[in-house]
Amino acid sequence: LFLISGGASSLCEVLEDGWTLAKLQAATQEKLANGASIAEINAMRKQLSKIKGGKLWQFISERPVSCLLISDVQGDNPAVIGSGLLFPAPTDRAFSWEIVANNQQMLAAMQASQILPTIQILPEFLSSDAEQAAKSCVDFLKDQAEGVYIWGGETTVTLPANPGRGGRNQHFALAAALALESTENI
């Protein structure tokens, strides 16, 4: 039984010969710094890995395999979740899989909980540059009624030559704060 979720790409690895963790981290950091999408980063990870892209099967005995997936990717493609450790699956193996949770289910659960009086779940999956996505969200909010608006997604960021600290979510939040600076009631 496997449980594979978002983040598995970073936590689970057996590198191809000639690669070290330090080299992989440097290659990943370079891609992240240049605004690469998670799909582009995971494509690189699959090329450099002995287990991603369905290659984990070579280390699994002939027993039946079940896989539960928690998706953090747009479209819930199992070959993308965790860089597809078990996908594509061999056709001659006893294999079952199911997506047990995803971004939309989490957002719907938040809305159904009614913890806050007015929660609006936005269907747009934020996947552009963090600063552009923040501006787009702020522009949208300027014309909306009072309430809580929730988006899901995974943005990108292009780092300057001398980057500061933080990550994509912090960059998004700070860009939104700057865009909201002269706006009232948001």
Regions found by a protein language model. Name each.
Residues L1-W151, T155-I186:
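N-terminal loops that bind phosphate or other acidic moieties
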